[in-house]
């Protein structure tokens, strides 16, 4: 221990002395400002649109898209088909909703419907879309107000507040219907307010037709046979489905909804744990005609699969991603699908669900851990 303390003391002295030198040099530079020098923002604005000598992006929104696809290997035991999953956790805010958030805001700006610094954006959300919208609003300079059911995870609320959004929680028993109603009430009472309306905005579907669908087609070399996706706003399954069908009419498209809130299969809305899916009504942009059917997945099965994906595949994902995987495996086990390529999506990163039912046992275990003695 004495030798270790001596080493650390010498190391600290070197670092401190070096830090002092760097501080003096840096301070000298700062004390002599260059007259009329342009700000960083001005320099960025003056950059040419294409910089062939560098791959540096000029803004974070340019990082959206081009996410990887990976095969599942261990949880697929007993499946006759191959399952590949597009990992949307690699988006800037770790969810697929970055795509439509960017698309809808850009579309509204191009149409002259909203203006940074003047317009207040209001939107109902179950979480991930709200985070993505708050992220885009912060980057572009909009005030953002979000309504959401109170059952959404604490992590999602913190993420939204991190980007400066105002949150209004609604009665969980009213589901997304109550959240949407509250958003419309705020829209009517707030000056210069605008709602992007993710459930009816064609730009939501368009971005998946123009980006997500082509990415899947290209990464699979056009070999995708089946695409399966959970239904929230319906933008992803509709946009991707329409694109894949345009390339190959024989590609089969399946939706996914919670068994406890199977509205799209003629059932009634109800409470469930698959956050982001099963909004309790049929969204306007949802294209049901191109789908073979909507697969029902129980919340318990979705949660268990999400846990297995982390333990067996090294993929820490959210509950809706677990539901998508359950549905994909159901299709992969059918004899008629043997040898086919099924593609689905892991829509968000699992760290966003630490306070949810997904990790409640592990959270309690971690909270109860005690330190061990160290000699």
Curated annotation (Swiss-Prot):
Any GO molecular function: cysteine synthase activity
Induction remark: Up-regulated by ethylene treatment and wounding.
Required cofactor(s): pyridoxal 5'-phosphate
Binding site for pyridoxal 5'-phosphate: 128, 232-236, 320
GO biological process, any: fruit ripening, climacteric
Presequence extent in this chain: 1-25
Entry keyword Nucleotide-binding: no
Enzyme class: lyase
CDD domains per the UniProt record, alphabetical: CBS_like (cd01561)
Stored InterPro entries: Cys_synth (IPR005856), Cys_Synth/Cystath_Beta-Synth (IPR050214), CysK (IPR005859), P-phosphate_BS (IPR001216), TrpB-like_PALP (IPR001926), TrpB-like_PALP_sf (IPR036052)
Subcellular location: Mitochondrion
Classification via Pfam families: PALP
Keywords from the named record: Amino-acid biosynthesis, Cysteine biosynthesis, Lyase, Mitochondrion, Pyridoxal phosphate, Transferase, Transit peptide
Modified residues (N6-(pyridoxal phosphate)lysine): 97
Cellular component terms per the entry's GO annotation: mitochondrion
Tissue specificity note: Expressed in leaves, flowers and fruits.
Reaction(s) catalysed (UniProt annotation): hydrogen cyanide + L-cysteine = 3-cyano-L-alanine + hydrogen sulfide + H(+)
Main location as per UniProt: mitochondrion
EC number per UniProt: 4.4.1.9
Function: Probably involved in the detoxification of cyanide that arises from ethylene biosynthesis in ripening fruits. Has only background level of in vitro cysteine synthase activity.
Family affiliation: Belongs to the cysteine synthase/cystathionine beta-synthase family.
Protein name: L-3-cyanoalanine synthase 2, mitochondrial
Organism lineage string: Eukaryota, Viridiplantae, Streptophyta, Embryophyta, Tracheophyta
Gene: CAS2
